[in-house]
């Protein structure tokens, strides 16, 4: 038995015989009277010729199934608890750097086309395109800009119309004098073209008017009287008196 084992170890070209020597505990046809093969004699007998062929792990021993490539395996591996990993690609976030994340994702999943499937890859690419640089996002930005511009224009138009209405209302607020008030004012104007502050106060109290209303009426009446006189320039005395009257009289609303 020891000679057969040593002969198996010396021959480097005997593949099947060497494998049979190492695997089978019994030799050839004799199975009853021969003791089982043990590894202890190999460890004890350190022969020189045996040391030359000690590296037989790659030829004699059967390699593990995972040592061969996937194509060379005779039987496919079956694992009960193994689940196929689903590739999930998160949609690329919109950034200002362009489509660099999308290109990197497309290159990374290019080798997994057969296993992951074309549908998921198409979904990932579609998600990548839904960023700031996608064709659908550009019209949305333009629409928002146009809507904001229209809102500003409408606001400006409303403000201008409100200002115009307020100006019109301010201009339309005119005092409607009665016939009795006009008669008293005309009588006073024939005697005094310019009123003192005390006299203006008395007229306002008697006619139920404000001092400002009396003052404005006398100013308008003087302008009308000057136009009626034939366009003669007013004397400096009249202009100074008019200015003093306007400055001395407080405006009462």
From Swiss-Prot:
<dbReference type="GO" id="GO:0000981">
    <property type="term" value="F:DNA-binding transcription factor activity, RNA polymerase II-specific"/>
</dbReference>
<dbReference type="GO" id="GO:0000978">
    <property type="term" value="F:RNA polymerase II cis-regulatory region sequence-specific DNA binding"/>
</dbReference>
<dbReference type="InterPro" id="IPR001356">
    <property type="entry name" value="HD"/>
</dbReference>
<dbReference type="GO" id="GO:0030097">
    <property type="term" value="P:hemopoiesis"/>
</dbReference>
<dbReference type="GO" id="GO:0003700">
    <property type="term" value="F:DNA-binding transcription factor activity"/>
</dbReference>
<dbReference type="InterPro" id="IPR009057">
    <property type="entry name" value="Homeodomain-like_sf"/>
</dbReference>
<keyword id="KW-0804">Transcription</keyword>
<dbReference type="GO" id="GO:0001501">
    <property type="term" value="P:skeletal system development"/>
</dbReference>
<dbReference type="GO" id="GO:0060218">
    <property type="term" value="P:hematopoietic stem cell differentiation"/>
</dbReference>
<feature type="region of interest" description="Disordered">
    <location>
        <begin position="136"/>
        <end position="158"/>
    </location>
</feature>
<dbReference type="GO" id="GO:0003682">
    <property type="term" value="F:chromatin binding"/>
</dbReference>
<dbReference type="GO" id="GO:0048066">
    <property type="term" value="P:developmental pigmentation"/>
</dbReference>
<dbReference type="GO" id="GO:0061056">
    <property type="term" value="P:sclerotome development"/>
</dbReference>
<dbReference type="InterPro" id="IPR017970">
    <property type="entry name" value="Homeobox_CS"/>
</dbReference>
<keyword id="KW-0678">Repressor</keyword>
<keyword id="KW-0539">Nucleus</keyword>
<dbReference type="InterPro" id="IPR020479">
    <property type="entry name" value="HD_metazoa"/>
</dbReference>
<feature type="DNA-binding region" description="Homeobox">
    <location>
        <begin position="170"/>
        <end position="229"/>
    </location>
</feature>
<dbReference type="GO" id="GO:0005634">
    <property type="term" value="C:nucleus"/>
</dbReference>
<keyword id="KW-0238">DNA-binding</keyword>
<dbReference type="GO" id="GO:0043565">
    <property type="term" value="F:sequence-specific DNA binding"/>
</dbReference>
<keyword id="KW-0217">Developmental protein</keyword>
<dbReference type="Pfam" id="PF00046">
    <property type="entry name" value="Homeodomain"/>
</dbReference>
<feature type="region of interest" description="Disordered">
    <location>
        <begin position="226"/>
        <end position="253"/>
    </location>
</feature>
<protein>
    <recommendedName>
        <fullName>Homeobox protein MOX-1</fullName>
    </recommendedName>
</protein>
<dbReference type="GO" id="GO:0045944">
    <property type="term" value="P:positive regulation of transcription by RNA polymerase II"/>
</dbReference>
<dbReference type="GO" id="GO:0061053">
    <property type="term" value="P:somite development"/>
</dbReference>
<dbReference type="GO" id="GO:0006357">
    <property type="term" value="P:regulation of transcription by RNA polymerase II"/>
</dbReference>
<dbReference type="GO" id="GO:0005737">
    <property type="term" value="C:cytoplasm"/>
</dbReference>
<dbReference type="InterPro" id="IPR042634">
    <property type="entry name" value="MOX-1/MOX-2"/>
</dbReference>
<keyword id="KW-0963">Cytoplasm</keyword>
<comment type="function">
    <text>Mesodermal transcription factor that plays a key role in somitogenesis and is specifically required for sclerotome development. Required for maintenance of the sclerotome polarity and formation of the cranio-cervical joints. Binds specifically to the promoter of target genes and regulates their expression. Required for hematopoietic stem cell (HSCs) induction via its role in somitogenesis: specification of HSCs occurs via the deployment of a specific endothelial precursor population, which arises within a sub-compartment of the somite named endotome.</text>
</comment>
<dbReference type="GO" id="GO:0055001">
    <property type="term" value="P:muscle cell development"/>
</dbReference>
<keyword id="KW-0805">Transcription regulation</keyword>
<keyword id="KW-0010">Activator</keyword>
<keyword id="KW-0371">Homeobox</keyword>
